[in-house]
Structure formats: structure tokens, C-alpha cells
Amino acid sequence: MKYISTRGQSPALSFSEILLGGLAPDGGLYLPEQYPQFSADALSAMRGMNYRDLAFTILSRLIDDIPADDLRIIVDKTYRADVYAYARPGQDAEDITPTYKLEDDLYLLSLSNGPTLAFKDMAMQLLGNLFEYVLAQKGETTNILGATSGDTGSAAEYAMRGKQGVKVFMLSPHQKMSRFQTAQMFSLQDDNIFNIAVKGVFDDCQDIVKAVSNDHAFKAKNKIGAVNSINWARVAAQVVYYFKGYFAVTADNAQQVSFAVPSGNFGNVCAGHIARMMGLPIAKLVVATNENDVLDEFFKTGVYRPRGSANTYHTSSPSMDISKASNFERFVFDLVGRDAAKVRELWGKVDAGGSFDLNDGGWFAKVADYGFVSGSSNHANRMQTIKATHERYGVTIDTHTADGLKVALEHREAGTPMLVLETALPAKFEDAIVEALGHKPERPHSLEGLESLPQRFEVMEADAAVIKQFIVEHI
């Protein structure tokens, strides 16, 4: 299995060769040369598998340069009930991603039972173990540079803390995460973790990461790696829970399901797209945005129009406060028939601060063939959805999951199960839950008092040169 760049000007590489990086040298994103296919018979064989067996079956089709026995050990080490221990009462932590039935054909897919209470743990824990393995095999070290709007940072840091050969430099928008998210990250005292609070918004952080990644000399000299959602291994890991969710709510492979996905950087729903391309019977992939609705605009109009920092809203679902969806390029590559020259043309416009219209050339008309639909929500919608869900079903959901549920209800079809991806637990967004319900959400006892722990972080300007200098001084 080789991986190619969406921009077509980088050599095809193996999984381990692209694992530690992010962007391809030509600025594109990596995808498999062709997607592995799972036949109806294969799906039937997978139906009864536990999460570890399912993950190994899927990942071994995407990773063929790590010996199967070693990959099996890595997967088994990653997906354990004691790692994903924060299941709801009545759920079995051994399921790793249990489903929670709200009503007939409407479910939550619980992806947030890991150490940082967010779905990012599903991929990041695997990434930490893969990084440690591959670095040890190569006798190398890496310095991870990442950007977070809230959940990626803590998931990356908890996955990489104490790992041999790894240092983490994580950029976050200063004072724009929830208190819980901030405390989760900044309270870590591990010597290999560095938190940098950037004066700006998430897209400023992401732009700095891209600028550093595109400085090939600096990247090579300082062994810069990436764990943001552009990292292929993260997307690959997320493919697994679409299969797990599908099997949990269907009796046979003749049935289709839909997934509603709270969306910012498009990485999570991109994994759903890839699962669908691999043969999973998915009816609809519902892209749910908040007020930062660049993706909703595209799926309704065919126009992709990223906003600048000044036009990016700070909302009550902050992990989705993103207006340049970095994984979107992967889907567009497939949409335009894997025409790398076309992708280079389109992202040339984006990288220059512009937009593009896929009605030109008739590409937008093909979006329906891939099952995508979309919708957006605002703060009032989120508060109402949290309140209604609590009253009707006796369950508390966070603001991002509320975005997903609100839009899911707009796209339900009779007889087709709809799984809403629960992307974070409500304890991470206490203020919003208090506003919606009048009381604080429950949080795991082990996380009581998190906000009062000592914090260690640096506040810096949104300047790639300043960040580079800090990295050089601390590696």
C-alpha cells in the first residue's frame, strides 16, 4: 500500500514513511493510491468482531509495512477498556465506542470515553503508540508541532506524554478554549510537553503550523512531525468506529445507516467518506457546523469560501471554530476524479486567500453521489437541543454533539438508523451546560479540581518566526 499526495508532485510512500509528517512536500495531503475494498462476505465476517479485532482487520489493509504481529500488539495496547474508561452508566467500556439509543433509529455513537473526554483520543492514542514504535525502529526522534482549537491538543499531549523520542509543541488560541480544555493541557508538567498560547484564533495557529511545515529545510533540520487532523494515521484510525457503529445498529449488510458528524476541520467526516469508499453501506454523511459554516455553505452551494481570522466566530462549540477545513482537500481530490492538477489549481486560490466554485465544470453535481448533506446551528439551537435531549431522553450532551444532533434531525429518513457522533463529554463545557440546564454536568471523580492545578504555558504572538525560535531553543 502506497500513499500519494492530493497535489500529485510528491513521490508515493509507505505508511511508516508518511506517519511522522503531515503535509506532503508539495503541500498536499496523503491518501491511499486506492482504497481497500470490503466485500459483503468480508463485512459479514467483521460483524461480530470486538473493537480491537475490527481495528486490526481494517488497519492491516492500510498499513502493510509494519509486521502484522507488531501491529496487532500496538492495536491491542491502544484499544483497552481501562484507557476508554469513561463510559456512561449502563454502557460497557469494553465496547470502546458503545452506542446509546435515544429512540428508534436514533443513536449516539460514544467516541469520548478516552482520557481527555473527546473523540480525538480514538486516533491519538493509536498515534502515540505508532510514533513510539516507528521511532524506535528507526532509532530517531521527532518534535511534534500541532495546533488545537480545544480537543486535539489535550488528546495529543496525553497520548505523547512520557513517550520516548517525542517532544510536543502545541499551539492554541489564547483564552479561546473552555476552562476545562485549557486546564487539561496547561496543567501537564511533563518535560516533553510545551504549550504555546497564541494571540489570535485557531486558524492563526493552523497557519503557523502550515508555514513551518512548508519550510522544508527547517522541518528536516529540526525533525518536525505532525499530529493534527491532516496526519493520515489519525484519519485511518477514525475509519474503524464507522464500521463499529454500523454493525452495532444493523442486523445485516443489506441495511444502510447515516452518520451525523460535528465538523470543523473535516477530518472526522472524511473518515466516514473513506469508510463509505471502502464498502460500508452509508446512506448519508451529515456535516454539522456551527456559526463558522464554511462547510455548510459548500455543501449547499458548491462554493468553498474560507474566512479570515476576523470573520471566524468564537462560539460555544469552540472545537468547531474553524473556517479553513484542512482535510477538505482529501474529499475534493476524490470528487474531481483524483485530478491532482485540478486540486493544485483550486488550492492555489485558497492559499492565496481566495475561494473556488465547483459548479464550474459540473463537479458540485457529483457531491450527492458521495452521500454528503449539511446543516448549521447557532448558540440558541445548541442550548435548546441540550435542554430537549436532557428532558426527553434523560441524557446530557455537549455543545458539539448538540450541533450534530440538531442537524441530524433535519436529515432523518424513515427506516434508516441515524448515528450522531458524540465528539466530547459535557464535562468539558461546563459553562454551556449550566446555561442550558441550570446545573453543572457530572465529571469523572479523577478530574475533580482540574482547573485549580498549576499551569505551565507560554503566551506568544501569531508569528511563525517567533514560534520557530522557541522550538529551536527547546529541542
Curated annotation (Swiss-Prot):
Catalyzes the gamma-elimination of phosphate from L-phosphohomoserine and the beta-addition of water to produce L-threonine. It comes from the Bacteria. The keyword Lyase applies. It comes from Methylobacillus glycogenes. Belongs to the threonine synthase family. It is an enzyme of class 4 (lyase). One of its GO terms (molecular function) is threonine synthase activity. The modification N6-(pyridoxal phosphate)lysine is found at K120. It holds the Pfam family THR4_C. It catalyses: O-phospho-L-homoserine + H2O = L-threonine + phosphate. This is Threonine synthase. Its cofactor is pyridoxal 5'-phosphate. Pathway: Amino-acid biosynthesis; L-threonine biosynthesis; L-threonine from L-aspartate: step 5/5. Keywords: Amino-acid biosynthesis, Lyase, Pyridoxal phosphate, Threonine biosynthesis. Its EC number is 4.2.3.1. Disulfide bonds: none annotated.
